[in-house]
Amino acid sequence: MSSSPTESEILPKESHNSIDEQSQQPANTDTLVKDNSFNEQDDQEVDNDYKSNDEPVQSQDPISPNMASNESGNSENTSNYGSSRDENVYQKTTLWMGELEPWVTEAFIQQVWNTLGKAVKVKLIRNRYTGMNAGYCFVEFASPHEASSAMSMNNKPIPGTNHLFKLNWASGGGLREKSISKASEYSIFVGDLSPNVNEFDVYSLFASRYNSCKSAKIMTDPQTNVSRGYGFVRFTDENDQKSALAEMQGQICGDRPIRVGLATPKSKAHVFSPVNVVPVSMPPVGFYSAAQPVPQFADTANSTVFVGGLSKFVSEEELKYLFQNFGEIVYVKIPPGKGCGFVQFVNRQSAEIAINQLQGYPLGNSRIRLSWGRNQNPIAAPALNYQSQVSQTTIPATSLFPAMSLPPQAQFSPYPAVAPSPLALQTRGAPIGMEISIGSPALVPDQMHIPENGNSDTMPVPNTQGKHLSAEE
């Protein structure tokens, strides 16, 4: 069994800036630009809205005018807004307004537009669970001319605040109750999104080129609202979807080129558990490849994840954002120019879940590969020190038992982990002072102080230079 890459093999003890070129395998330089397909069912956390007609669960709502009427968190009666108008006229009188602060209310938005001389009706979309605004709303103006005039305020300061207007034309639905069958929707996957890119940026990029673009959604962590670096864009025209797949590959959004791929229809998407956590005992459901299996004789004190295939554009802060959703982090290290990094968690279970769920995750312009590293800042109990010491030496193979790089642990073997016994018995063929039992390799000292009568009231003191014996020695 080959040993896992360690930070000490990559980062010399005296300095983290000096790298041994032979200590690390070349980083995975396969980019994602050539991969033009993505199955939405492969994703760890496909939003429920893309799998069924149910409301999204604890996630930021997409920039979707059509979904405004489905948002149950806002109960005001707006079903008659513009109900007698022609669809084309309606689309020219309603604007989407985004990037709203959590404290923003409908009354505040209405007051802002009234200050600018606009009579408006506002529907603020709220999170159905928290009651807070979802970061966007729809504003209906008295006429197409008024709406067009209001669009000129895009990226200009909002009166009384230090924020800017973020405006766009609503592509349908808006303040009216409108039911559109999602069977006629066509989605694409959008990956490699920069952390500073929001849904407005993604929606604007696609809506400026494709008239049928109706919504954009960036997947975020439900607790922290931190972007996961990917999302989905919906179209009502299949031709626009196909054109976007062919034309938008590598287009710049924010400060990075994006990757697009075909998303599997929601009817084929796999439904995950409500908490979006896969038990460690279950088969891996990683992004692109099978998750790293936990070694049978694993060091139960290890909570460090080795991250390979890192893009040079990825920073330690971005890596921390990605992994912090799985548990409390001790530290994050990215050695310069090596295309890899290390993430140490407080709990081993957090590391196991991260390895299972983030294997092959698209980050930057490559897919990361995960495996077990070794703790550089041990936080485990002292009782595991012996196991850590033994793991440094490989036990030689015998005709009966294969070679092992770690001793059997209690949870994997009928034999408990064995340390040198203070009252060890003499066994034929074995050094004095040590008992050898099958399945329980022991650390045998080179020298032990034994009284001539063979009895001692004190534990033999082993030399620090020890060796391992197999069952045959």
Curated annotation (Swiss-Prot):
GO terms for biological process: mRNA splice site recognition. Residues 69-83 have a biased composition (Low complexity). InterPro entries: Nucleotide-bd_a/b_plait_sf (IPR012677), RBD_domain_sf (IPR035979), RBM42_RBP45_47-like (IPR050825), RRM_dom (IPR000504). Residues 10-19 have a biased composition (Basic and acidic residues). PROSITE patterns: RRM (PS50102). One of its GO terms (cellular component) is U2-type prespliceosome. Residues 1-86, 448-473 are annotated as: Disordered. Keywords: Phosphoprotein, Repeat, RNA-binding. The modification Phosphoserine is found at S64. Residues 20-39, 55-68, 453-467 have a biased composition (Polar residues). One of its GO terms (molecular function) is mRNA binding. Residues 95-165, 188-260, 305-370 form the RRM domain. Pfam families: RRM_1. PANTHER family: TRNA SELENOCYSTEINE 1-ASSOCIATED PROTEIN 1-RELATED, TRNA SELENOCYSTEINE 1-ASSOCIATED PROTEIN 1-RELATED-RELATED. This is Uncharacterized RNA-binding protein C23E6.01c. It comes from Schizosaccharomyces pombe (strain 972 / ATCC 24843).
